[in-house]
């Protein structure tokens, strides 16, 4: 049996369709997953056996063009299997067989990566399709004339805070993109404040990034209201100088201010947080399809 050239392998056997992934490589990846084979230490003999059995079952049902690709891959696997089974002492031939085997493994790993990426992009596309774009609005009309507006504590960058908030809400909603309506869940401000401080106290050097704190929060009973309240609590703690911050790349490093933290929380500060969070809407609606999981 004549060996197939490297160029033939690259041009025919390893082609894939970006959306459907219906071809020889996709079949091999499915077989590897079903048989729980180690793709990094692939047993070519077992894989070729499983693949040939699959092609034999497929011959009478599959389109002739697609079948041709599968037959070419089956032929290549049988050739590689035969070369591996034949005894040889030629080091160059042994190295050639191992190179071909490793080339197949590398192609499968690369293909599987593209496949996973395609599935991720598909999920992102479906999630984005559930959202609606609004034109830029002027929010000054919603400002209360008799309210006292204070600047952000210690000159925090509002754009960084916005990026963090957008990222947190987006990732949370991506995990729950089938939710249609989020019911109101009441949060205890004092407990949430304690939750944050305990997390920082237990972190190395009593410091952690804002994103890492939100990442470890359980999805259950967490919605936009929760994240808005937590953001206000963080700002209040910074304003009270109970936690310090350091700017990172689109994030903030929060650190316990040991000199100011006390176990008995100031009730007036807690009341301040409650007053701020009470202005949050109580009928939060997210434009997602499905049922509520809270």
From Swiss-Prot:
Q: Does the keyword Cell cycle apply?
A: yes
Quick check: keyword Transferase in the entry?
A: no
Subcellular location, record wording: Cytoplasm
Keyword annotations for this protein, in alphabetical order, are: Cell cycle, Cell division, Chromosome partition, Cytoplasm
Q: Which InterPro entries match?
A: ScpA (IPR003768)
Q: Which GO terms describe its cellular component?
A: cytoplasm
Q: Report any Pfam family annotated for this entry.
A: SMC_ScpA
Q: How does it assemble?
A: Component of a cohesin-like complex composed of ScpA, ScpB and the Smc homodimer, in which ScpA and ScpB bind to the head domain of Smc. The presence of the three proteins is required for the association of the complex with DNA.
Q: State the function annotated in the UniProt record.
A: Participates in chromosomal partition during cell division. May act via the formation of a condensin-like complex containing Smc and ScpB that pull DNA away from mid-cell into both cell halves.
Q: Which family does it belong to?
A: Belongs to the ScpA family.
Its recorded name reads Segregation and condensation protein A
| Gene transcribed to yield this protein | scpA
């Amino acid at each position: 049996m004549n060996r197939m050239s490297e160029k033939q392998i690259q041009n025919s056997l390893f082609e894939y369709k970006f959306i459907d992934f219906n071809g020889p490589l996709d079949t091999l990846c499915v077989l590897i997953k079903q048989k729980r084979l180690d793709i990094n230490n692939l047993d070519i003999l077992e894989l070729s056996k499983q693949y040939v059995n699959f092609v034999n079952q497929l011959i009478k049902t599959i389109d002739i063009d697609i079948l041709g690709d599968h037959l070419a891959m089956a032929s290549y696997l049988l050739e590689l299997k035969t070369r591996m089974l034949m005894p040889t002492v030629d080091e160059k031939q042994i190295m050639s067989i191992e190179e071909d085997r490793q080339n197949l493994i590398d192609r499968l790993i690369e293909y599987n990566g593209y496949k996973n990426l395609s599935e991720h992009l598909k999920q992102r596309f479906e999630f984005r399709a559930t959202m609606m774009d609004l034109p830029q609005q002027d929010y000054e009309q919603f400002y209360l004339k008799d309210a006292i507006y204070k600047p952000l504590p210690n000159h925090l960058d509002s754009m960084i805070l916005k990026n963090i908030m957008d990222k947190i809400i987006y990732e949370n909603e991506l995990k729950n993109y089938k939710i249609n309506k989020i019911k109101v869940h009441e949060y205890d401000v004092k407990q949430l404040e304690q939750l944050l401080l305990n997390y920082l106290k237990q972190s190395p050097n009593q410091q952690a990034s804002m994103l890492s704190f939100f990442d470890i929060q359980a999805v259950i009973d967490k919605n936009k209201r929760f994240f808005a309240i937590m953001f206000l609590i963080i700002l209040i703690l910074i304003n009270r100088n109970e936690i310090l911050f350091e700017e990172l790349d689109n994030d903030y490093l929060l650190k316990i201010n040991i000199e100011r933290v006390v176990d008995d929380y100031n009730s007036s500060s807690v009341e301040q947080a409650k007053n701020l969070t009470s202005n949050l809407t109580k009928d939060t609606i997210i434009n997602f399809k499905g049922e509520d999981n809270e």
